[in-house]
């Protein structure tokens, strides 16, 4: 097996173009960007006024099968496909989420793509970037401080301190902060109460920023966020505290999309970063809308498999944005299919055709899901260096035999050149296949019916069960008139079910909803299932242990 440069070595050897040159490539005027050094910029929201009459480009969504813990290269395929579209003469922008420091320091070590299909400068993007994550964290924690101060100063709204639902946030994995007590140390420090932290990317403010259309919509959404309940059970919002203006002020720059570039010097918008297993899992609507005004094709991704990010993209993001995806790319890998066929994680580099063939059932279910939405699709078989020709052909052959458009993808090793077959196939299905896009549920459906339709159609479950706590919350949501919102299921990414141990295509199972939480500002109801947590913990050997910086300031260990 030939040796390859690491992701960070490729990134650091790439000569970046000035970001002003990337902007000119998209016909962005100089006064419409705000530069952060030479290689990063924010795009002014004023650009929409100039481009409002321009037709939108087509949105291509990249999703995947249920992944292994290491991921299946979906971000890499997303970047590589956008580069490949340029190589076949199509004007494209890749629109991605910003990485969270939690997974970067924890398991993943970075999330800017890989190999010769990365967004750059990857060190900046994976760490502090343009400060968006910190602004969102600050806004989240400012709101928490405003709530406690309101209570300390007399509690005019009669907030029940046992029913404060707004948590503090931190953009790191820190299990010790899941459950905390604040207000200790005497009367001067406020009222003692139970509290806790969510990771920033699970904060409702992250979702609000990513679904807002503009600053006015952002402020409206911030005002409507439910932060607590009164002693008689009435919801208390951020607007009732009168702080939506201050929160919007903290976010006035964070709402602007970030312009960067790929390894091949093609444009990229990297903005917003909600997780898909505990939030809606898509980049900001503003970035997607901006990209659609600037290019003929927008290649974007939704977190984890089609059961999580893609389902939420369809039901939440497209509804908020009023657009229809042009096509979907479903990323599949030999190693993940072998895992779903029963190969232990430690043995995934070993050839196992029988396990691979069994695991294809997982891919089949995700294809069924995208087909249920009525969208054209292509299976991207993402090649890893250890894959054998027999294994790759087994997947491609199954796709051919069953009438599923598919292409081998080698963008990690070859950049855009390794994705031109995929790019041509995607263009082909958009031009030749009918787009029959429709939702799986209507907003007028009950919460129970929305969850049942997702569970049966997307997960393959027999139905949905509710804990006693969730049943009480159902009644509260209906009483408060929130049952007309879409639902956002918080679920494990490793299985179609709510049990991460049920690999492949599980049968004879139900989804159990243990808690329902309104995110009224974001515009959806979060349904928590299984043991999913909104503040992750670090693994035994965090990726941070391999990270360093040399005397010249050069980063090491990111990938």
Swiss-Prot record:
Residues spanning the membrane: none
Catalytically driven reaction(s): (6S)-5,6,7,8-tetrahydrofolate + formate + ATP = (6R)-10-formyltetrahydrofolate + ADP + phosphate
Enzyme class: ligase
Enzyme Commission numbers on file: 6.3.4.3
Alphabetical list of InterPro entries matching this protein: Formate_THF_ligase, Formate_THF_ligase_CS, P-loop_NTPase
Protein name as annotated: Formate--tetrahydrofolate ligase
Pfam families: FTHFS
Residues binding ATP, per UniProt: 68-75
Assigned keywords, A-Z: ATP-binding, Ligase, Nucleotide-binding, One-carbon metabolism
SUPFAM superfamilies, per the entry: P-loop containing nucleoside triphosphate hydrolases
Family classification: Belongs to the formate--tetrahydrofolate ligase family.
Domain of life per record: Bacteria
One GO process term, biological-process aspect: tetrahydrofolate interconversion
Gene3D superfamilies assigned: Domain 2, N(10)-formyltetrahydrofolate synthetase (3.30.1510.10), Formyltetrahydrofolate synthetase, domain 3 (3.10.410.10), P-loop containing nucleotide triphosphate hydrolases (3.40.50.300)
Pathway: One-carbon metabolism; tetrahydrofolate interconversion
GO molecular function, one term: formate-tetrahydrofolate ligase activity
Lineage, opening ranks: Bacteria, Bacillati, Bacillota, Bacilli, Bacillales
């Amino acid at each position: 097996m030939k040796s390859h440069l690491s992701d960070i070595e490729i990134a650091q050897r790439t000569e970046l173009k000035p970001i002003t040159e990337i902007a000119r490539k998209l016909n962005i005027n100089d006064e419409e960007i705000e530069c952060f050094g030479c290689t990063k910029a924010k795009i002014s929201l004023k650009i929409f006024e100039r481009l409002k009459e321009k037709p939108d480009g087509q949105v291509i969504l990249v999703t995947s099968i249920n992944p292994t813990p290491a991921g299946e290269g979906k971000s890499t395929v997303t970047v590589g496909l956008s580069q490949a579209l340029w190589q076949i003469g199509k004007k494209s922008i890749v629109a991605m989420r910003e990485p969270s420091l939690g997974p970067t320091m924890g398991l993943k070590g970075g999330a800017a793509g890989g190999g010769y299909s990365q967004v750059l400068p990857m060190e900046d993007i994976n760490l502090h970037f343009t400060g968006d994550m910190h602004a969102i964290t600050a806004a989240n924690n400012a709101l928490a401080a405003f709530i406690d101060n309101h209570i300390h100063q007399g509690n005019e709204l009669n907030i029940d301190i046992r029913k404060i639902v707004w948590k503090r946030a931190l953009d790191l994995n820190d299990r010790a902060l899941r459950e905390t007590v604040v207000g200790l140390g005497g009367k001067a420090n406020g009222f003692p109460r139970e509290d806790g932290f969510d990771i920033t990317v699970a904060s409702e403010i992250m979702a609000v920023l990513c679904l807002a259309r503009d600053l006015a919509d952002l402020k409206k959404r911030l005002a409507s966020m439910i932060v607590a309940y009164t002693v008689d059970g009435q919801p208390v919002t951020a607007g009732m505290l009168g702080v939506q203006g201050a929160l919007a002020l903290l976010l006035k720059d964070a709402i602007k999309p970030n312009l960067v570039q790929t390894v091949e010097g093609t444009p990229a918008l990297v903005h917003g970063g909600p997780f898909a297993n505990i939030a809606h899992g898509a980049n900001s609507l503003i970035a997607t809308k901006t990209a659609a005004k600037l290019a003929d094709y927008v290649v974007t991704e939704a977190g984890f498999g089609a059961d999580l990010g893609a389902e939420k993209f369809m039901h939440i993001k497209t509804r908020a944005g009023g657009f229809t995806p042009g096509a979907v790319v479903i990323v599949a890998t030999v190693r993940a299919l072998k895992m779903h066929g029963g190969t232990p994680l430690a043995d995934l580099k070993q050839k196992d055709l029988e396990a691979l063939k069994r695991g294809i059932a997982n891919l089949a279910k995700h294809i069924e899901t995208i087909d249920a939405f009525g969208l054209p699709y292509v299976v991207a078989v993402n090649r890893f260096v250890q894959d054998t020709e027999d294994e790759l052909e087994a997947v491609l052959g199954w796709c051919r035999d069953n009438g599923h458009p598919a292409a081998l993808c080698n963008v990690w090793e070859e950049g855009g050149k390794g994705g031109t077959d995929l790019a041509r196939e995607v263009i082909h299905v958009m031009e030749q296949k009918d787009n029959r896009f429709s939702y799986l549920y209507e907003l007028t459906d009950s919460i129970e019916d929305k969850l049942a339709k997702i569970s049966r159609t997307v997960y393959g479950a027999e139905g949905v069960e509710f804990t006693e706590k969730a049943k009480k919350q159902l009644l509260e949501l209906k009483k408060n008139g929130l049952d007309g919102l879409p639902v956002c299921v918080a679920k494990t990414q490793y299985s179609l079910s709510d049990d991460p141990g049920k690999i492949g295509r599980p049968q004879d199972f139900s989804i159990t909803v243990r808690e329902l939480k309104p995110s009224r500002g974001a515009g959806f109801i979060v349904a928590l299932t299984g043991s999913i947590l909104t503040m992750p913990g670090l693994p035994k050997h965090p990726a941070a242990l391999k990270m360093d910086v040399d005397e010249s300031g050069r980063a090491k260990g990111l990938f």
